[in-house]
Amino acid sequence: MGDDDLELEPDPSAGQTAAIDRIVFFSDAVFAIAMTLLVLPLVGGRTDLPVWEQIKHKVPELYAFALSFWVIGLYWIGHHRVYRRVRAYDEGLMLLNLVELFCVAFLPYPTALSGRYPEDVASTVFYAASLSVLGLVTTVHVWYVVHHRRYANVDDRTARRMITRSLSVPIVFIPTIPIAFLNVVVARSLWWAVFVIRFLFRGSVPRAD
């Protein structure tokens, strides 16, 4: 039998893996671009002031940049934890992934407003609401993966832990929305509690094979 007579059967799992890799690469690019765009409000400004005065004027924007950068970074890590276990996908999963990426890509805008108007109630509420929506969408995204059993080697306890961890941002940011109407400074200070909640929800998640 010659080589020309050989017909290799397509490997469906190989096609699924390649398609999932494309989803992951595209998602990584969106996360990276969004995190990079966060720095744009720090560029420019008054150049007639001494350097330390320029930095002082940028403190609110530095605050917003640092918080958003680390929150997006946490979601990128969570996205990686989910998709390293995904072995199959459907249009529903792709759509939820796109909705999450939409929220991530949108975040530089409320971040810029939050840094530019640090004492404004509207900018504070808008920022907290934007991150809350991102957190809720991500939770639905993770739930969808778990519900359809697209994890590999993840038990129910671990799945619940991952869903709970995805709620860490909404748990912190949703209550700060009404608080902002009473005291903007307190509301903004509470945002950093997200890292405490994240630590409490950290748990140990077994690596995928």
Where are these regions (language model features)?
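Multi-pass alpha-helical transmembrane bundle typical of ion/small-solute transporters
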Residues: 2-209
